[in-house]
C-alpha cells in the first residue's frame, strides 16, 4: 500500500525562557489528543514552509511573526502515513493572543517541557531546538503511536 506524504510546519514561539505550546483537547478524533505540541499545520499548495508557518501562527495564536528560523526537518513515518515537518523557533513576534479552536495555549518554562505529555519523537528534536544545534534532520519511525526508531542525519 502506498504511503501518503504530508508536508507540515511545527512552530515554537519563544518568549524569555518559555515556549508557547498547544494542549490538543478540542477537536473530535484528534490524533494528537492529550499531547502538548507546538503550533502549526499543513503547508498549502501555493505556500513555502516559511509562509505556512507565519499563516498557522496567526490562525492559531493571533500573533504576527516578523522573522523566523527553520531549525530542522523531521520525517515522521507511521504505517501508511509519512509527514515531512519543518520545525521553527520564533522569537520576533507581537500582537494579541487569541483562543485556539484546536486546544489550550500555554507558555511553558523550557526547563519544565519534559514534564508535559508529548510525542516521544518530540523529545528527540526539542533538545536540538532548545540548544540551538545546527540545522538538523531526522526520521522518527512509529508503529501505531509508539516510537520504534530514530535516524539522525
Where on the chain are the PLM-derived regions?
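Short, surface-exposed acidic-centric catalytic microdomains
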Residues: 33-39, 47-49
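Charged phosphate-binding loop/patch that engages nucleotide di/tri-phosphates or the phosphate backbone
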Residues: 131-153
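Unchanged
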Residues: 43-66, 75-129, 149-153
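Conserved N-terminal beta-strand and adjoining loop/helix that marks the start
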Residues: 1-21
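Short, glycine/serine-rich, charged loops/turns that create anion-binding
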Residues: 18, 26, 75
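A conserved beta-turn-beta hairpin within the catalytic core of GNAT-like acetyltransferases
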Residues: 29-34, 82
Amino acid at each position: 500500500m502506498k504511503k501518503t506524504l504530508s508536508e507540515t510546519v511545527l512552530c515554537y514561539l519563544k518568549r524569555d525562557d518559555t515556549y508557547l505550546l498547544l494542549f490538543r483537547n478540542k477537536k473530535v478524533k484528534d490524533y494528537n489528543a492529550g499531547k502538548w505540541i507546538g503550533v502549526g499545520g499543513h503547508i498549502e499548495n501555493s505556500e513555502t514552509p516559511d509562509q505556512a508557518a507565519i499563516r498557522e501562527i496567526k490562525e492559531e495564536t493571533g500573533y504576527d511573526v516578523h522573522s523566523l528560523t527553520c531549525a530542522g526537518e523531521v520525517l515522521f513515518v507511521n504505517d501508511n502515513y509519512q509527514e515531512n515537518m519543518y520545525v521553527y523557533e520564533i522569537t520576533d513576534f507581537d500582537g494579541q493572543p487569541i483562543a485556539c479552536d484546536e486546544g489550550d495555549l500555554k507558555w511553558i518554562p523550557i526547563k519544565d517541557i519534559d514534564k508535559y505529555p508529548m510525542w516521544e519523537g518530540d523529545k528527540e528534536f526539542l533538545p536540538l531546538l532548545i540548544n540551538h544545534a545546527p540545522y538538523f534532520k531526522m526520521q522518527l519511525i512509529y508503529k501505531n503511536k509508539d516510537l520504534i526508531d530514530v535516524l539522525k542525519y
